[in-house]
């Protein structure tokens, strides 16, 4: 199917474009971008007046829960949620059941995605066998089978010598290491951010040092091995400072944060709200401010959701025993657009963090509207108003702290390889 997107505000940081243009998609590829183009007779015409046309958004950190945990989410529902949120590609973390630590499981995910997924699915393999932090997984075979990175996400690689070797091997194979940076000894029995709110609620806290100490270690190991590293889901002002300083020294470090870390504080936990329980935990106002500054000054490269679906039975329990994690694919875009409204970022920089940089970090041939590129396109209605309602979410799980909240901004169309996979009602 050929598609002609007419008169939208095209924002493509990969080409430094921000102007009203037409876009022609032919045979699943970007054919032409320009002013006053003529629509071919056989093309579906999309009138994009008043809408934003961007490279397809890429979420480099999601949990699709397949294989083994499909009662929370699966490839179909997870990629439906991605498409509804404007994402044309997702990278899925390996903490499935079994863990994606070998080529058989990677191949299963790749083949299932080819058969069922609405968007591109790029698997992330485990750093260590079973993500147990004892022996390295076969990174070469993981890459060969289709993994775009390795991570033990959900838990840190506690052994620093093992992490050093992981970085060295991954560098040799051209595989990105995504670090879940957390010092478990400092986390202890903590269930939320250590601070005033935790004290008031009588809950055990997780100090900011649990993140900062681990981020510092991982950054120094990357510097020592002269290897690239990507730090997942940073949430503290200290992490921002450590990574900013490391970049200034020339360390090959990139990082991401999630919308909840610039949209909420630990106040959201009041009332023992388990849908506001995640790891790392929601922090304090000064951390939120630091995350926004880090996004604005380029310290933070990407916005990723850490979409972590859980069944109601795993969330509708006492706060101490509720599982960590929230869904985020369908709320990420409006929450991130708020950064533009608040003048933290301009629109081009936001698209860079949600499409261009994730593609670059993971080595994908996406995140651009250049001629010949795969036609992954997100068309955004920045003024669409809607309310987050559980029954209207595509995700199988409904564990969002934003339920009931009014949102502004939504994906009007999501186009993957030249095919419309989502159209807003």
From Swiss-Prot:
Q: Which GO terms describe its molecular function?
A: allantoinase activity; dihydroorotase activity; zinc ion binding
Q: List the disulfide bonds.
A: none
Q: Which CDD domains match?
A: DHOase_IIa
Q: Which PROSITE patterns match?
A: DIHYDROOROTASE_1, DIHYDROOROTASE_2
Q: Where does Zn(2+) 2 bind?
A: 153, 180, 233
Binding, Zn(2+) 1: 61, 63, 153, 306
What are its cofactors?
Answer: Zn(2+)
Origin: domain of life:
Bacteria
Write out the pathway annotation from the protein's UniProt entry. Answer: Pyrimidine metabolism; UMP biosynthesis via de novo pathway; (S)-dihydroorotate from bicarbonate: step 3/3
The family line of this record is: Belongs to the metallo-dependent hydrolases superfamily. DHOase family. Class I DHOase subfamily.
The entry's function note states:
Catalyzes the reversible cyclization of carbamoyl aspartate to dihydroorotate.
List the PANTHER family hit by this protein, alphabetically: ALLANTOINASE
Identification of the protein by name = Dihydroorotase
The organism encoding this protein is: Geotalea daltonii (strain DSM 22248 / JCM 15807 / FRC-32) (Geobacter daltonii)
């Amino acid at each position: 199917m050929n598609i002609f997107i007419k008169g939208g505000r095209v924002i493509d940081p990969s080409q430094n474009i921000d102007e009203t243009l037409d876009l022609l998609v032919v045979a699943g590829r970007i054919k032409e971008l320009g002013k006053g183009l003529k629509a071919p007779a056989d093309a579906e015409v999309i009138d994009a007046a008043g809408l934003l046309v961007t490279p397809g958004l890429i979420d480099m950190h999601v949990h699709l829960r397949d294989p083994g945990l499909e009662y929370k989410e699966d490839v179909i529902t997870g990629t439906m949620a991605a498409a509804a949120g404007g994402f044309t590609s997702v990278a899925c973390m390996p903490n499935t059941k079994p863990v994606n630590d070998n080529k058989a499981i990677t191949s299963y995910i790749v083949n299932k995605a080819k058969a069922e997924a609405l968007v591109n699915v790029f698997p992330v393999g485990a750093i260590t066998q079973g993500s147990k932090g004892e022996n390295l997984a076969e990174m070469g075979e993981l890459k060969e089978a289709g993994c775009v990175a390795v991570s033990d996400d959900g838990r840190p690689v506690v052994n620093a010598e093992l992490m050093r070797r992981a970085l060295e091997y991954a560098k040799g194979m051209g595989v990105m290491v995504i670090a879940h940076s957390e010092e478990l000894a400092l986390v202890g029995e903590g269930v939320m951010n250590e601070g005033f709110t935790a004290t008031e609620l009588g809950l055990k806290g997780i100090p900011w040092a649990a993140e900062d100490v681990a981020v510092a270690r991982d950054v120094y190991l990357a510097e020592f091995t002269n290897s690239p590293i990507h730090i997942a889901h940073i949430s503290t002002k200290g992490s921002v400072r450590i990574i900013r300083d490391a970049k200034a020294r020339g360390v090959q470090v990139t990082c991401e944060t999630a919308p909840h870390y610039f949209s909420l504080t630990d106040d959201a936990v009041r009332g023992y709200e388990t849908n506001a329980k995640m790891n790392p935990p929601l922090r304090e106002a000064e951390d939120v401010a630091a995350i926004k500054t880090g996004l604005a000054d380029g310290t933070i490269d990407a916005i990723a959701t850490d979409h972590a679906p859980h069944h109601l039975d795993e969330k509708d329990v006492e706060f101490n025993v509720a599982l960590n994690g929230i869904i985020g694919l369908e709320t990420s875009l409006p929450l991130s657009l708020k950064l533009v409204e608040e003048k933290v970022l301009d629109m081009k920089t936001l698209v860079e963090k949600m499409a261009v940089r994730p593609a670059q970090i993971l080595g994908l041939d996406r995140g651009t509207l250049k001629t010949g590129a795969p036609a992954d396109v997100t068309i955004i209605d920045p003024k669409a108003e809607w309310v987050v309602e559980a029954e209207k979410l595509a995700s199988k799980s409904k564990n969002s702290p934003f339920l009931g909240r009014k949102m502004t901004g939504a994906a009007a169309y999501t186009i993957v390889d030249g095919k419309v996979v989502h159209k807003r009602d």
